């Protein structure tokens, strides 16, 4: 195989799908480098999502479930309340998937910040937790959550929910 063959194949695929790739090598072996935003996409047409989850494996799966090419872009992931609040300050969020129990802090502060910050175009806030007890459900809705899902049985609901949100946004 020629040394530049893989690069030529990747470049061809990117060109065919009107995509670009970040040029950074990433933080280390086996780390993923995010694709750059498609320059032809109107940013206002994209739904911006935030994933707040302290388990890297679950966060990665949520990014896969929530992302829809040319429709939904995950603009940030956060494992702690502080990281999530910083992401809320940096980005306009249309959809947030929030775990309640985090490595530092809780999802309740994130929910309250999102609810306070989104004003006329409120973010859709989905709580996804392993602790789906009635008291936490009530507290999540009081803080401003729109949906309350149990990780053990509602995980597969997320793509359908994202589809419904996209249909609502389109209308």
Regions found by a protein language model. Name each.
Residues 53:
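Conserved acidic carboxylate
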Residues 56-76:
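Two-component/phosphorelay signaling modules centered on CheY-like receiver
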Residues 77-95:
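Acidic, metal-coordinating helix/loop segments flanking the phosphotransfer/catalytic sites
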Residues 80, 106-109:
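Acidic catalytic/metal-coordinating carboxylates
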Residues 99-100, 129:
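Active-site residues of response regulator receiver
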Residues 108-121:
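Short amphipathic alpha-helix used as the core "switch/output" element in two-component signaling
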Residues 109, 132-149, 153, 160:
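Alpha4 helix (beta4-alpha4-beta5 surface) of REC/receiver domains from two-component response regulators
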Residues 122-132:
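A short, hydrophobic beta-strand element within the central beta-sheet of small alpha/beta folds
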């Amino acid at each position: 195989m020629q040394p530049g063959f893989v690069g030529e194949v990747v470049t061809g695929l990117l060109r065919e799908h009107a995509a670009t790739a970040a040029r950074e090598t990433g933080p280390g072996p086996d780390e993923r480098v995010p694709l750059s935003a498609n320059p032809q996409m109107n940013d206002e047409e994209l739904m911006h999502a935030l994933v707040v989850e302290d388990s890297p494996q679950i966060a990665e799966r949520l990014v896969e479930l929530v992302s829809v090419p040319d429709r939904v872009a995950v603009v940030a992931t956060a494992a702690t309340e502080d990281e999530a609040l910083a992401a809320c300050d940096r980005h306009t969020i249309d959809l947030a998937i929030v775990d309640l129990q985090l490595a530092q802090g809780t999802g309740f502060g994130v929910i309250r910040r999102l609810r306070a910050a989104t004003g006329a175009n409120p973010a859709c806030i989905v709580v996804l937790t392993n602790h789906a007890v009635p008291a936490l459900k009530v507290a999540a809705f009081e803080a401003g959550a729109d949906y309350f899902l149990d990780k053990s049985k509602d995980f597969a609901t997320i793509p359908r929910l994202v589809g419904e949100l996209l249909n609502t946004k389109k209308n």
